[in-house]
Amino acid sequence: AGAASTHLALIVIAADDGIMPQTLEHLEILTSLGITKGIVALSKIDLVKDLEWIELVEMDIRELLIENKFELISFNKVDSLSGKGIQSLKNNLMNIRPVEFLANYSSNFRINVDRVFSKIGFGTVLTGTVNNGRIEVGENIEISPTKEKAKIRGIQSHGKAVKHINAGDRVALNLKNVKTSDIKRGTVISTPNLLKSSSLIIIYLKMNKNTSWKIKNKQRLRFYFGTLEVLGRVTLCDRMALDAGERENVIVQLETDICVALDDKFIIRTYSPMKTIAGGVILEINPEGTLKELRKTISSIPLIIEDRFYFFVNRDRIKPKNSHVWEKIFLNSSALIEGWKTKFKLISSNSILYTKRSEEESIKEMSLFLDDSYKKNPFRKILNDDIIITSLGWSEIWLDTIKKKLIQENIIKIEDGGFLKVGATLNFSKKDLELLNRLESIIEKSELDQISIKKIPGILNIKQSRTNDL
């Protein structure tokens, strides 16, 4: 727990031992967390007198990294006692440009707490590595999952007091009016109202290729999100177990609420004995629908984040969101969201974001609904917004967007506080005409006497709603 907040790996392998089982496990953890670049330090070279052995170990390591698609930045042979190769290793570390790993990060602040303590004269202090965004002394933050609010009293980074911090920084935060008991390892500190708590998530699960374990349906497992360990169970979609190297979108029901973001990566271990057996990516948080419904649909959720963005925008068309909301959901930079909008040719109108396909499908859906409404009830030619919202489940802003498009295309027109389809005619059946004639006759015969509308259903032998339409 905690490795998820890193971007590069320093893989240290002893020259006298070579590749060990833990080396393979650590490499699988790194690749599962999306850490695919790093530096190798071959240590204890002073203990190996046979230079050919060192060359063989180096060859094995390079082949292992290639096999796991791990990009090697530099290979360093070091001896800690004499200091040989240490300065070269330091130089290689310092030459890495962090900007390439942080360019697409959201401006919203988020950090996973890995340690918390109290310091005399200061109060509660927490430490961690900044996942996203930037924050300054004096700004307000939110503690999740409790959703308590607090203010940053002071910030330190690498032992020095600083005014602000950015994504990737290793920091200590001093919080005002917060008890150490309110925070623990795994707690998330973020921009207020950024994250939602949930115990139900959809994940892309990938089994380690070297594991001898299986993951069975409803199996209890250990999940490591950021610095948090939490227990939960997986629900598989169309099989009873996953074997080594297999992958699938699955449902996870956790035993406690967590605060995570889309595309967060994590590790899975067995409950007992504790063995690392899989990794994954969070595809969706707090999905709507029953488990039975989700099992039928989650396999279509894409793994690639930009494709998933398009999928969600299209899927959620009847309740669309704006760019700012999508930026918070995906915790990515506004520039990246704008790039996706351009790539997928999304429409930004009426303060919402949607696809051309969504627009076309909704126009067709509304047109069919109007035709069906006239067929079921030829007396009601003019419809109001509430009928559409209730019947189709659309949001008000989406109905307004589609109505404007239909008016532009002369498919509907506004009339008497509602709207109707252009060219719609009232096609009365023989029974409809008979009822109208009978009602007209009743009204004419009453002359100046009032008739209670509640009595008409009994006279005509029809329902009250039908009477209102007549």
Walk through the language-model features, giving the residues of each.
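Short, intrinsically disordered, charge-balanced linker/junction segments flanking boundaries
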Residues: 1, 257, 467-470
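Conserved Switch II/interswitch segment of TRAFAC-class P-loop GTPases
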Residues: 3-26, 31-55
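Residue-level signature of catalytic and energy-coupling elements of molecular machines
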Residues: 10, 30, 43, 61, ...
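G-domain G4 guanine-recognition motif of GTPases
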Residues: 14-15, 39-55, 75-84, 176, ...
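Conserved nucleotide-binding/hydrolysis micro-motifs of P-loop NTPases
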Residues: 15-20, 35, 44-49, 80-84, ...
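Conserved catalytic-core segments of large NTP-driven translation/proteostasis enzymes
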Residues: 55, 63-211
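C-terminal non-catalytic scaffold/interaction domains in large multidomain proteins
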Residues: 286-470
